[in-house]
Amino acid sequence: MGVAGSGVLYFLFNNVPSPRFWLKKTQLIGTENPEGITGYECPYEYLRKSYGKHHWAAFVDKLSPNLQNEDPAKYRMVLETMDVIHLCLMMVDDISDGSEYRKGKPAAHKIYGAPETANRAYYRVTQILAQTATEFPRLSPWLMTDLRDILEGQDMSLVWRRDGVNGFPGTASERTAAYKRMVLLKTGGLFRLLGHLTLENNSMDEAFSTLGWHSQLQNDCKNVYSSEYAKMKGVVAEDLLNREMTYPIVLALDASGGHWVEAALKSPSRRNVGNALKIIQCDYVRDVCMAELARSGAPVKEWLKLWKREEKLDLKA
């Protein structure tokens, strides 16, 4: 191959966005007759096996130690509702992100297909809304309000992904404030829902908003700083590849070399992503992220023990 041909290949390899199939560890084949393996709610039940049925039980028990004995029907309803909302949001998120893996296993849509997985998520959410309205109508306003907040936050995130930096606030302080508002809606709303359904009041709103912010920070940081998390997802910096705003990315936009981050958000080529990742993993951005994790985690450390997220943040520039 001549010099010209080699130059063309070099340019394409480093500047054209990577096809996502290059990131797969294996080519996955859809399971035949999935209803015979995971039951009627196949994509949903498949994901629930990874997290465990009623995986919010420790939180509910801490919030209301006597609820299981005093009102077992409500106890089950709260746990089932939290499972449905949390897991179905993840099912749709994984489709939106083009994720290959979830918790080290193939994402549900890689097995059952995006149409079935998305429809199952919507169906299960609709089922739980109807069941709540019929069996526990006093919980319906809490559920509807918090679900609206969660989806509003998710919508903000998706609009930013679509519009890129041009649709994001211009100054560093405005960017951070806008990102935090989105997180407090999307992730904070999920934790507030837990408190609202269990206690039927808003006494835990402040603590659970903080817990939601900290939890999202953990996810954001693991995406670019954790080799263990990268192994489970099958790729480093999936958020950046998806042109998604996260706390490290927002900070890196205003760091030295931030133009590379902006370039990667506009066109996630190998060259742009590689250079942007160096900025995101630099000491300055990483130190600010670690400081915010420590600050936000301090007032909710007892709840974090129940959350059990301990991946090491070991990746640096």
Swiss-Prot record:
> Which of the seven top EC classes does this enzyme belong to?
transferase
For the ligand (Mg(2+) 2), the binding residues are D93, D97
- Residues annotated for substrate binding in this entry: K53, H86, R102, K186, T187, Q216, N223, K233
Q: Which GO biological process entries does UniProt record here?
A: paxilline biosynthetic process
Top-rank taxon, per record: Eukaryota
GO MF terms here are: metal ion binding; prenyltransferase activity
UniProt lists the family membership as follows:
Belongs to the FPP/GGPP synthase family.
Q: What is this protein called?
A: Prenyl transferase paxC
Species: Penicillium paxilli
